[in-house]
């Protein structure tokens, strides 16, 4: 498992595509930016945003 990291902007969107794949994801900028850009997040945090 990758260590928690700060993901912002296009890096965050790319990470969501990788983690969620065909399921897609719902993009809630306020929540995920707070969780993954301002603070580091991990792959499990990202999975919470998959559809």
Swiss-Prot record:
Coiled coil: none annotated. GO terms for molecular function: hormone activity. GO terms for cellular component: extracellular space. The keyword Hydrolase does not apply. One of its GO terms (biological process) is glucose metabolic process. Disulfide bonds join 8-37, 20-50, 36-41. Keywords: Carbohydrate metabolism, Disulfide bond, Glucose metabolism, Hormone, Secreted. It comes from the Eukaryota. SMART domains: IlGF. PROSITE patterns: INSULIN (PS00262). It is found in: Secreted. InterPro entries: Insulin, Insulin-like, Insulin-like_sf, Insulin_CS, Insulin_family. Insulin decreases blood glucose concentration. It increases cell permeability to monosaccharides, amino acids and fatty acids. It accelerates glycolysis, the pentose phosphate cycle, and glycogen synthesis in liver. PANTHER family: INSULIN, INSULIN/INSULIN GROWTH FACTOR. Heterodimer of a B chain and an A chain linked by two disulfide bonds. Belongs to the insulin family. This is Insulin. It comes from Caranx sexfasciatus.
């Amino acid at each position: 498992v990758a260590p928690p990291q700060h993901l912002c902007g296009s890096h965050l969107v790319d990470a969501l595509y990788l983690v969620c794949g065909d399921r897609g994801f719902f993009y809630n900028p306020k929540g995920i930016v707070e969780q993954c850009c301002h603070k580091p997040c991990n792959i499990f945090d990202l999975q919470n945003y998959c559809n």
